[in-house]
Design a protein with these regions (language model features):
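C-terminal accessory regions
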Residues: 379-404, 549, 555, 562-564
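Flexible coil/turn residues that form the inter-helical turn or adjacent wing/linker of helix-turn-helix
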Residues: 185, 247, 390, 440, ...
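Helicase motor core with emphasis on the C-terminal RecA-like subdomain
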Residues: 19, 23-32, 36-40, 44-56, ...
Length: 624
């Protein structure tokens, strides 16, 4: 049954009008999408759109942004255009809409001329409710000629942070979308994004020429994601230990270079872990293969550059690890937002080394001194402060976006394992003395080698084994001294100087009172072990479900998805399966009460799941 057939059955509701009541939106939410209630902010945004108002919607990833425009699209009588930046994201959204019986399609460069003509014919004949297009396509003369033959009721512009030079993912073609307002003066425009600070919001309003818009700024908080930072000591070993703890869960590892992506993916494969590389240097066919394998649960982990980002709508990504420092908090937030989109517990882990920050800073400082450089330096400084923070990471993250909270989250490494302070004056003096004695011409690892009394050849050649500081820190590990040096850098007592490919440590003027012992210094006890173990369970998460039944339901879902040639989460996501495993419905009347089961999916997919649940119950009864 399609949505159009479903509409005909709902004869009491007049879908021919471009104005519908709140009850209609709620009815669509229940019957088409299978959810029992709206999330915070969704209904007010939908009602504003149905009242023909433009809107700006800033809502966290996983917060239900898509429903904000998909439900009005079903209420309006004409076509809804959705501007989306990535081909993969378009296809994924369309697949999910089709699974719910909604007539949707896309136009992009991956299609042949004949395929595009077929889609255009469907749109012009009124057979489509939603049409996804790229911003580049939306600006072409041929597109405007075609779309002039369609009744466009509504326009949604997704990922609108791309419109702003302040945004972390600037796309120049987005800035030209303001022409949509003139071309479709009667169609309300909705701009959507998960990440936009004040400057970015202003750019969106100006460039899209939104008229007296309804502005909804939701919470940026993702309470089901635990944020942790790992100080890099033996990075590959630490990453391998973290992956081992995931026990086969799906995840994404982000790196800043293609070479590193390839090396890490190969290293994981050698350990028997299902992992694939993804970066811009691969062919389109290779990238599509990896993305498809990941979405279909045929690959556990994707190791990627930022090229692998917005196109991922997979709901059961359980962790995102950043092996390198991102360039901004917006980028970090957007990328970690790929985890836990089903509202179940997920992890975001940042592997951090101050040298990563120094290299990124050097790259930016070598750019021409233009406003864009200052913007990027400001954003880099903010992510550096996030990494070095000694207070709740979630508070730092939310404060950056102007959402001020006072209560710690109890779901980050700082809250779960608060830093312990100690009198670090002597340790600081040892490090600073070593830096000074070797002429302020060497990097952190060399300073540590001197402190620990290493017998390496380079130290002997420079006769630094004869210095008074040689070996005065041999009672502490290399990792311990790395942590001390990082803190001294963060405190501004020593600085990293980059010259070509070398990073040297030098003292700042602020170091002199410490060297002389004229003022005290508190340092955090080095956190040699890394990732905190506790996980806060979000309010919507199901906890007392039958684990054996859940595993069987997941196996059945994969079997059905492979047969239908769609990703498993499009059948039902993990949160829906967990509800099934808890409440164990055995009739269609019971199944329709499960979140994520709408009329279309009930008829298309429910019977095998109902049969499996009945079989499981009989087996359990017989076993008892």
């Amino acid at each position: 049954m399609s949505v159009e057939e479903w509409k005909q059955q709902k004869s009491a509701v007049d879908f021919s009008q471009d104005s519908v009541k709140k009850s209609t939106a709620l009815d669509i939410l229940h019957s088409v999408f299978g959810y029992q209630s709206f999330r915070k902010g969704q209904l007010e945004v939908i009602e504003a759109t149905l009242a023909k108002k433009d809107s700006l919607v800033i809502m966290a990833t996983g917060g239900g942004k898509s429903l904000c425009y998909q439900i009005p699209a079903l209420c309006f009588s004409g076509l809804t255009l959705v501007i989306s930046p990535l081909i993969s994201l378009m296809k994924d959204q369309v697949d999910q809409l089709l699974a719910n019986g909604i007539n949707a399609d896309y136009l992009n460069s991956s299609q042949t001329f004949e395929q595009q003509q077929l889609v255009q014919n469907k749109a012009m004949s009124g057979k489509l409710k939603l049409l996804y297009i790229s911003p580049e396509k939306a600006l072409t003369t041929s597109f405007f000629h075609f779309i002039s033959h369609c009744k466009v009721s509504f326009i949604a512009v997704d990922e609108t942070h791309c419109i702003s030079q302040w945004g972390h993912d600037f796309r120049p073609e987005y800035t030209q979308l303001g022409g949509l307002k003139a071309s479709f003066p009667d169609a309300p425009i909705m701009a959507l994004t998960a990440t936009a600070d004040q400057a970015t919001r202003q750019d969106i309003l100006i460039h899209l020429k939104l008229s007296n818009p309804h502005i909804y700024i939701g919470s940026f908080d993702r309470p089901n994601i635990r944020y942790s930072l790992v100080e890099k000591f033996k990075p590959m070993e630490q990453l391998s230990q973290f992956i081992a703890k995931q026990k086969g869960k799906n995840g994404i590892i982000y790196c800043n270079s293609r070479n590193k992506v390839e090396r890490i993916a190969e290293s994981l494969r050698q350990k028997g872990i299902s992992a694939e590389a993804y970066h811009a240097g691969m062919s389109n066919e290779q990238r599509e293969f990896v993305q498809r394998a990941f979405q279909h649960d045929n690959v556990q982990i994707v190791v990627a550059t930022i090229a692998f980002g917005m196109g991922i709508n997979k709901s059961n990504v359980r962790f995102v690890a950043h092996f390198d420092l991102p360039r901004s908090i917006e980028a970090y937030y957007q990328e970690t937002g790929r985890a836990g989109r089903d509202d179940l517990p997920a992890e975001a882990v940042l592997f951090y080394e101050p040298a990563d920050y120094a290299w990124l800073q050097k790259v930016l400082l070598e750019k021409p001194d233009i406003p864009q450089r200052q913007i990027e330096l400001h954003k880099l400084q903010s992510i550096g402060e996030f990494a070095e923070s000694q207070i709740c990471r979630r508070l730092v993250l939310l404060n950056y976006f102007g959402e001020y909270q006072q209560k710690p989250c109890n779901n980050c490494d700082i809250c779960l394992d608060p830093p312990k302070k100690y009198d670090g004056l002597v340790d600081a003096q040892k490090v600073m003395s070593a830096i000074y004695r070797v002429g302020q011409r060497f990097g952190a690892m060399y300073i540590i080698a001197v402190l620990r009394g290493s017998q390496n050849q380079k130290i002997k050649e420079y006769q630094h084994d004869k210095l008074s500081v040689f070996g005065i820190g041999k009672d502490r590990s290399r990792e311990y001294w790395q942590s001390v040096i990082r803190q001294l850098i963060h405190l501004g007592l020593i600085k990293q100087v980059i010259d070509h490919f070398n990073i040297t440590l030098q003292l700042t003027l602020e170091a002199l009172p410490i060297l002389r012992g004229e003022q005290p210094l508190q340092l955090a006890t080095p956190r040699i072990s890394s990732i905190a173990n506790a996980v806060t369970i979000p309010k919507r998460a199901v906890t007392n479900y039958d684990k054996d039944l859940f595993a069987r339901l997941r196996f059945l879902r994969k079997k059905i998805a492979d047969k239908e040639n769609i990703p498993p989460y499009i059948v039902f996501n993990d949160a829906t399966l967990q509800e099934m495993a808890q409440y164990q419905p055995t009739t269609e009347q019971e199944m329709i009460q499960i979140n994520g089961v709408g009329d279309i999916k009930l008829k298309r997919f429910a019977q095998p799941f109902l049969a499996l649940i009945k079989e499981h119950q009989i087996f359990r009864t017989t076993k008892k």
